[in-house]
């Protein structure tokens, strides 16, 4: 008889996505326990929820962070960067080749590990509900956490692939074969329902114990639900939730649960993990007994500073900061070759400037948001022990979502308030524009405030321009603004001289193909062809 197996370790996960059949085993494995005898205590239920969280980032760089970086590279904010090694799937993504094989394992790993997380959540939702808890409120909270995380995992999938298979219960291999894609609308409907269900039973951030900091909260669920609405253009549905979070308009009550950090320098500072601006973060630890830290910082760091230099900021992004007069955010977003005053790190000075050498890097810039000061790095630095939490949703983005929503609903005074709240922190003048000009100002603000945080690709794909085309269609392609800038306007000494990475990046972009990633070929094969490839891929 086939039996489902679940591990007993702290961050256990049922390692089975849509393509992982080897975890359905006939016999128990040593150190593991089959599910028929599990979920008999509240402690076992808690461990299962821990397993649900584990798949947010997993335990190394290649499962999730490689894909996150690929998403940045597929925008006007980042080059591939490393010009000394074969970029592999990064080249296929950045050059928009349309070849599903060349996309390699970054996309496949992301797909599979998101479904492994979904599987963990499905198990938790089903099994925890069957156990009698002494504290029914706590039982509901655990189920709510699983629903929040399932909604999060599906949200990450639909943004990148469109409609995906909706797996809402544990599946045997025979049930996976023949599975089909849900529509994008159907996928979003499930995401919305999960976030709605979750927020009803999740605590507020202020109600969390010290040991629970970082777990899902009602505020995180509201923020993610509002974001899901916004990405679909459901502004009327997003508005009341964003009003609750900002305490504005007809849904205002009391004072906001979240605030902006006092200074932009604190937002990605290692000493301000889970700060007052944070709605949801990937939690990390520098405990060397476990792989619970992050290696994203190493992945994007300078090759002259023990990094791998994949995903380097473009001069086009830097120009956007300078055009806006935004010196503060530029300083805490982009680290430059030759810099002698690196924020938070006295290692670098006039005698020992920071190095991002032109021979190894397409750009003389690195991601400052993920920079780890030398005296805070683990040994070895490239081990998964960096304790910088990855900010997934913060209050500044909530304010900008509110600004975008109110502008779309022709409530420009409210949109101005939210936009200027973000600008005040970085000492930029108030925006008084209305209508389309205000819309464009909000879009620029999102690029600057959230630069290198993984939102740019989402925005380029979803924002419509006045001609009805997406912004991504205006940025890329033979006549795209980013392509023309690099081929005709840029005088950047790094980008123009190091042609190991070609400056015509993005010239091959095609819509609608490149508005989504290709579904991994392995998933299509496993489904016996009932899962269909996204349009335009070969």
Residue ranges and their predicted role:
Residues 46, 50, 54-62, 84-161, ...:
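Conserved, well-structured interaction surfaces
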Residues 87-97, 277, 323-394, 537:
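Flexible, polar/acidic helix-loop-strand segments at domain edges
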